[in-house]
A protein has these predicted regions:
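Polyanion-binding surfaces on beta-sheet-dominated domains and ring/shell assemblies
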Residues: 1-192
Length: 192
């Protein structure tokens, strides 16, 4: 579950004259946040900083809170997609939509998209690739890589390239889902 608070006035000690301050908090299912949550916060904040048009809200702050309810794998990609949709729902101006996928490199070298938690544990490496997806003037999709995070040992450059390529194609599917979800939400608002 992801919530967006703001934009609101930033504290004087943290405000930036030329742009928005973006805070990300990741809360685990139970207990206190640990190093994994702190790393996720940094990765999400870095990716969202590329996505949000920060110059539109100088001296303001936005807080994105990710509450993990369950972890069945691909948590970083799921949190990023949730954060992007929450920002859209809050009306925050974005450069594009964040889309991508987690891929697991299995021991035999095969690449598995959207692995579950057990598949991630048994994988040689887990790679999360996320793209800023936006429409070009001709109607085609532009996918710009903004985050590639690997855990484990990716033994060959070809394996990493295969993970990024598969995630690039999955980004098109995620973008289509975004469009469908937003059209459904818009139609529900129009009917009211």
């Amino acid at each position: 579950m992801v919530a967006v608070y703001g934009p609101c006035e930033a504290k004087r000690t943290r405000e930036q004259i030329d742009g928005l301050v973006l805070d990300v908090i990741v809360r685990p299912t139970a207990g206190l946040p640990g190093p994994i949550e702190r790393e996720s916060e940094q990765l999400i904040a870095q990716a969202l900083a590329h996505l949000v048009l920060t110059a539109h809200h100088p001296r303001m702050a936005i807080c994105v809170v990710v509450q993990v309810l369950a972890d069945d794998g691909a948590l970083l990609a799921v949190a990023m997609h949730g954060a992007c949709l929450a920002l859209v729902h809050a009306g925050v101006p974005l450069r594009g939509m964040l889309a991508g996928c987690t891929a697991a490199v299995l021991v035999d070298g095969a690449v598995l998209l959207d692995p579950c938690a057990d598949e991630e544990r048994n994988a040689q490496a887990v790679v999360t690739s996320l793209f800023c997806v936006r429409m070009r003037a001709g109607g085609s999709l532009e996918r710009q890589l903004i985050l590639s995070h690997a855990r484990g040992c990716v033994t060959a450059h070809a394996q990493h390239a295969a993970c990024d390529g598969a995630a690039r194609e999955a980004a098109a599917c995620v973008t289509a889902f975004y469009r469908q979800a937003m059209e459904r939400q818009t139609m529900a608002l129009v009917r009211k």
